[in-house]
Amino acid sequence: MRRVHLELAILRYVHSIISCYSGPHGRVNVMLVRGLFNNFKIPIWYKYDHVLGKKEYLDIVEKMESLGFNVVSTSCDMARSNQKLAKSLGVTEETPYFPNPSRPASNIFWFYDICHLMKLVRNHLIDQGFILRGL
């Protein structure tokens, strides 16, 4: 059985930047499966302007498990919808994991994408500026 890392990525696009697409959508949610020990990353699911719910997420995990993948973790940005999904799965600071629906004796660990968060902070500082008092 292959070990994989299930990566949940929420991408937000501005309409004017997407020159190849002129539809009514403001964002797209994409889920990728990525190898933990193998070098691959494959998109497995996407929907426009959609919030991924607990049942739908667990169905995707079960489908990946049925295909022979051993799902061991999920990573995502800290969008409110992702925090809500994590909470619905029972993820907390003390227990950053939840039981794998296909293998209840195993856990799936939940990670937030720190590099993405640092990029958001950088962009906020560039866009909004900052004040250094006393200098």
PLM features per residue range, with description:
Residues L6, H15, F37, Q83, ...:
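Sequence-pattern detector for short linear motifs
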Residues M1-S22, S73, L89:
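Folded interaction cores of globular domains that provide primary macromolecule-binding surfaces
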Residues Y13-N70:
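Electropositive, glycine- and tryptophan-enriched low-complexity nucleic-acid-binding patches
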Residues L6, L11, P24, P43, ...:
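Proline-rich intrinsically disordered, low-complexity coils
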Residues M1, V51-L135:
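Histidine/cysteine- and/or acidic
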